Structures are given as C-alpha cells and as structure tokens.
Amino acid sequence: MLTKEFAQRVELSEKQVRKIVQHLEERGYQLSKTEYRGREATDFKEEDIELFKDIADKVKQTNSYDLAFDELEKEKDFLQVIVKNDDKNLPTNQNVAQLVEDLRLEIQKMREERHLLGQMMNQVHQQQQELKELQNQLTSKIDSNSESLKAIQTSQEAIQEAQASQAKVLAESTNKVEKNAVTEDKADSKDSKVAGVNTSTDAKTDTKAENAGDGTATKVDKEDQISATEAIEKASVEQSKNENAAETSNKEATVDADAQHDAEQQVAEAHAEASKQATSNDSLEAKAENDSTASQSEMSEPKPQEEKKGFFARLFNL
C-alpha cells in the first residue's frame, strides 16, 4: 500500500504520514520498502493503520511529534509489540557500530573544522590589530603633518610681517633721508645766498671806499678841506647802507660777523686816511695810490670761500 492510499485509510494527509514515517525511522524502526516508478517507497501494511491512528491522536493532544512519541514509548512499548514483532526489522549491532563510527568521524570532522575556525579567528584578530596599528600610525602622521603645516604657515606669516615692517622702516628712512637732503640743500642755498650777499657787500664796500679815497685825493688837490669833508660824508652814507644791507641779510640767514667787521674797519681806515689827506696832500696822494693799487689787487684776486659740505658729504664723512 502506497502513501496516498494509506493516507486515505488512516484519514491523514500525505504530509502527516511522511512526518510520522520520518520520526519512526529516526528512532531506529524500519518499515517495509518497495519500488515505485524507479524510486524507493514505503510499503504500508494493514497492521500499520492502527499504529498511525494512535500516533496521530497523540500528536493532536500534545501538538508535537517528539512529545507524542515520548509519551507513547513511556506508556507501553507498543512499537516493538505491534510493528516490530519481526527481529529482522530491529537495529542490529552492526548497524550500531556503523552509527558510532559515523558519529566519531563527524565529531572528528567537527573538531578539525573548529580548529580551522579558531585559526581563522586568530588570523582575523591579528589582522585587526595590524589594521589598528596602521590606523594609529596614519593618524599620528596626519597630526604631525598638520602641526608642520601650521608651523610653516606661522613662519610664513612671521616672515611676511617682518618684510612688511622692514619695508615700512626702509620707506620711512628713505623719506627722512630725502627730507634731510632737501633741508640741507635749502640750507646750503641759503648759506650760498648769504655768502654771496656778504661778498657783494664787501666788494661794494671796498670799491666804494677805494673810490671815495681816490675822489678824496683828487678833490683834496682841488678843493682841500671841503672835498675831504664831502668824502667823509659819502663814506658815512655808504657805511649806513652797508649796515642796512647787513641787517637785511641777518633776517634771511646767519650774518658773517667777520665780513661786517672788515667792512666797518675798511670804512674807518678810509675815514682816517681822508683825515690824514686833509693835512697833507702829498701823503694823501701817495696813500691814495697805494690804496687803489691794493684794492685792485684784492678785486683781481678774490678770497676763496670755504666750500660747504652737503648732506651726503657729511653723511659719508667726505
């Protein structure tokens, strides 16, 4: 009897019948087998109908195949009495030995697999440690690179600030030098103007004094005391003019005291010479000739003036 027909007889589904057969075979009980369409199939007997009905009822009560079989075995060994009356269907010692050997092989295989799994876990753990070390090294390198970049940026900023301050100081020093140069040039031009004014004043004073001396000598010959008096008055007028010119030059720059003193001394000498010429015509004529000769030599050979040093000459001590 095949599974489909047997399921109809016991009023169970084919799936339930196959499940019961599976649990029976797992517990070492073997049912009759036959060949159907080239495949092995269970050959159910009439006596199997009652057994399957009891098992189905017990499964409904316990809602579990395992619990149902356990309770049935505790109640009575009905499986061996009803189904397994034939010793041929009972498991033999040879089958038990084979099962033990199979179990031993499975256990050995499991141990080997467990050992391999342990090695793999160790390798994975080691690789994780190496990865952590690499990550730490990368992190430290990144930190060091960041610090070096910050240091470089700080040094660049410091260099830029130093360059800016240096350029500012250089510009200020250049401006100061230019201002000082302009000031020195102005001072030199003023000094040259003052020196020129003093020189012209001295020349005018000498020329006028000499001309006064010459005129005095000539007029003394003609008019005697009257001409001498007029010459003295002219010399006094020239002296006042020279004094006014000296005062004007003092307002623009520092007056050369030596030049003014020389002018006054020359005027005084001219006045004294005019007085002497009034008393003695001969001596006045000789004196006038000598003075005219001296004045011509002085005018032909002007006194060299000391060259004033400019700003850059004084800067480099030239």
Swiss-Prot record:
Coiled-coil ranges (or none): 67-157
Record's signal peptide: none
Keywords associated with the record: Coiled coil
Region of interest called Disordered, as start-end residue ranges on this chain: 172-318
Biased composition (Polar residues): 237-248
Annotated organism of origin: Staphylococcus aureus (strain Mu50 / ATCC 700699)
Protein name: Uncharacterized protein SAV0385
Comp. bias intervals (Basic and acidic residues): 175-193, 219-236, 249-274, 300-310
